[in-house]
Amino acid sequence: MSNPSDGSTDPKTTFMIEEIQELLPHRYPFLLVDRIIDYKESERAVGIKNVTMNEEFFQGHFPGRPLMPGVLIVEAMAQVGGIVLAQLPDIPSGKLFVFTGIDKVRIRRSVVPGDQLVITAEFLSLKRKRFAMMSTKAEVDGKLACSGELMFAMVD
């Protein structure tokens, strides 16, 4: 993929929110990736999610002690994985991979307002050009918050 924003033919390594919205179908309040800060085609993406007190889920999780729900951390990891899968070279443009399963997921620390999640998704495998597996992790200040293997399936 070329980088049309600067006229170069170097591979694109970062994505702003508008570009993420071209690759993922998610929208507010469920788009949980603010930016991709490192990308290597067919291998990995590193994204960030700035966690603010304005997130809707903090209204009920938990009043007086806001914690980002673990399932939403996992969803953010899946969305970063979706950036990699949406651009696999052997997959027709416009195909959608959906999150279908999790293995070995562990939540290791709380994520609170003011944290910045740094999410890494590494491509592991693609079977029958339809089923994919990613290794993912989310860190805050260099400390592991969550990790696991995520499965995806392409839908028609």
UniProtKB/Swiss-Prot annotation:
Domain of life from the UniProt record: Bacteria
Biological role: Involved in unsaturated fatty acids biosynthesis. Catalyzes the dehydration of short chain beta-hydroxyacyl-ACPs and long chain saturated and unsaturated beta-hydroxyacyl-ACPs.
Annotated compartments: Cytoplasm
Protein name: 3-hydroxyacyl-[acyl-carrier-protein] dehydratase FabZ
Family statement drawn from the similarity comment of this UniProt entry: Belongs to the thioester dehydratase family. FabZ subfamily.
Database matches in InterPro entries: FabA_FabZ, FabZ, HotDog_dom_sf
Active site: H61
One GO CC term, this protein: membrane
Alphabetized UniProt keyword annotations: Cytoplasm, Lipid A biosynthesis, Lipid biosynthesis, Lipid metabolism, Lyase
SUPFAM superfamilies: Thioesterase/thiol ester dehydrase-isomerase
